[in-house]
Structures are given as C-alpha cells and as structure tokens.
C-alpha cells in the first residue's frame, strides 16, 4: 500500500517534468494565415470615453497594430514604448490601437473612467498619457469576446503552444487561438488583413524591427 501511494505521488511529478522538458519554447512572432477571409474594416469599437464609435474602415492603407492592454501588469512598462513606436513609425503609416482588458490576472480592474488616471499616476505613472487611441474595456477571449478579436485570433496562429496556468483562465470556451496574456499584438496590413502576431513578452524593440522588415518587404513587392 505504501509503495503504491509513493508511486501515485511520483507519477504526476514525472509527468509534469516531462511536459515542461518537452514543451517547445515560445516564438516571438508568427505569420498570419495566407487565406484569411474578411478584413478589420467589417468591425468597430467604442472609444474609452464612450463618445465615439470608430469603424476600422477609417484606417485604409494604414498598418494597424492591435494591442490588448492592462494597467496593473508587469508589462505595463510597454505603454511608453508603444508611445515611442507610434511616434517613430507614424510617418510610415503605423497606427497603434489599445484595448483594455481585465481577463488576465485581473490586472485591468475598475471603470473605463479610471484607466487614464491609473496610467498617469500609478503605472507607468510620472504623468504618462498614451498618444494612441484607447477603446472601452472588454473581453478578448471567451463567449463575450469582441468580434474584432475573434477575427484577429482566427487569422493568426499563436506563437506559443502553451495555454498557460488554469488558475489564470477565467473565460469559457477556451480555444487554441486564444490570447494568453496582456500586451499581445496583431499587425494588420494596408488592405485590412492581419499579417503578424506577437507573443506578449516580445520586446517592443523586436516588434519594431519586425514591422520595419515587413514594410521593406511590402515595398519590394
């Protein structure tokens, strides 16, 4: 009996070790599928202050970067870097769009009206103000996910095979293309079709380099 109990404890440990050892490392990015049907121009979203419903068809011939953001996350430091990215690549047609979400570690709590003060005075703080458009807070996974994120996720494979810890998954249903954490990014081309998807921990400097390579390749076509 004692031997059986010992084996029952050891087996799960061995299985966990096997899974961790054999898990493939995350890629920093993935190319989106070549046969995507539809464009972002079919979708819209309400601005953070609730005053305007923006149709994404107002971004024709622009390179649009969709980012699901959160205020109280270890990656919130990417906010100022996104400002720099917007400023530096705006002359090349880049538009950054931010979508606050509270689905990952409950790191985007509060009302829409609390988001900008939280960014300005808490994280990243020091008077920070985003220079790109933020939209109202909403889900990016699950039954109530925003339709544009349904489209983006189905258009691009995820850079990681790991869904993450079940204690962080609060939505249903769970799908393989789901966003894993705050600050994942999708780049949409000038025709409204998604082209690239980045893992959330990919540095903004790498995202910038990837976008510049993409723009150079696009120019050569």
UniProtKB/Swiss-Prot annotation:
Localization per record: Secreted
GO cellular component annotations of the record: extracellular region
Expression (tissue specificity): Epididymis.
SUPFAM superfamilies (UniProt xref): Thioredoxin-like
Transmembrane segments annotated in the record for this chain: none
Keyword Plastid listed: no
Keyword Glycosyltransferase: no
The family this protein is said to belong to: Belongs to the glutathione peroxidase family.
Domain of life: Eukaryota
Catalyses which reaction(s): 2 glutathione + H2O2 = glutathione disulfide + 2 H2O
Gene3D superfamilies cross-referenced by the UniProt entry: Glutaredoxin
Active-site residues, Swiss-Prot/TrEMBL: 73
One Pfam family per UniProt: GSHPx
InterPro entries in UniProt: Glutathione_peroxidase (IPR000889), GPX_AS (IPR029759), GPX_CS (IPR029760), Thioredoxin-like_sf (IPR036249)
E.C. no: 1.11.1.9
Gene Ontology biological process terms in this record: response to oxidative stress
Protein name, per record: Epididymal secretory glutathione peroxidase
Key words, A-Z: Oxidoreductase, Peroxidase, Secreted, Signal
Annotated function: Protects cells and enzymes from oxidative damage, by catalyzing the reduction of hydrogen peroxide, lipid peroxides and organic hydroperoxide, by glutathione. May constitute a glutathione peroxidase-like protective system against peroxide damage in sperm membrane lipids.
Listed GO MF terms: glutathione peroxidase activity
Signal peptide start-end: 1-21
Enzyme class: oxidoreductase
PROSITE patterns: GLUTATHIONE_PEROXID_1, GLUTATHIONE_PEROXID_2, GLUTATHIONE_PEROXID_3
């Amino acid at each position: 009996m004692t031997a059986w109990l010992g084996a029952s404890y050891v087996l799960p440990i061995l299985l966990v070790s096997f899974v961790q050892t054999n898990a493939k490392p995350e890629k920093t990015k993935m190319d989106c599928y070549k046969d995507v049907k539809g464009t972002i121009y079919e979708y819209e979203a309400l601005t953070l202050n609730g005053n305007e419903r923006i149709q994404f068809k107002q971004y024709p011939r622009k390179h649009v970067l969709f980012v699901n953001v959160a205020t109280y996350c270890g990656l919130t430091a990417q906010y100022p870097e996104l400002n720099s990215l917007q400023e530096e690549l705006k002359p090349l047609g880049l538009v950054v769009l931010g979508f606050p979400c509270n689905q990952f570690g409950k790191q985007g709590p509060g009302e829409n009206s609390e988001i900008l003060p939280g960014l300005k005075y808490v994280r990243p703080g020091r008077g920070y103000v985003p220079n790109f458009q933020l939209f109202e807070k909403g889900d990016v996974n699950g039954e109530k996910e925003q339709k544009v994120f349904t489209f983006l996720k189905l258009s691009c494979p995820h850079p990681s095979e790991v869904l993450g810890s079940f204690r962080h998954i609060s939505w249903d249903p769970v799908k393989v293309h789901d966003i894993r954490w705050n600050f994942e990014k999708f780049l949409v081309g000038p025709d409204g079709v998604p082209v690239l998807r980045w893992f959330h921990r990919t540095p903004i400097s790498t995202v910038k380099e990837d976008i510049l390579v993409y723009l150079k390749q696009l120019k050569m076509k």
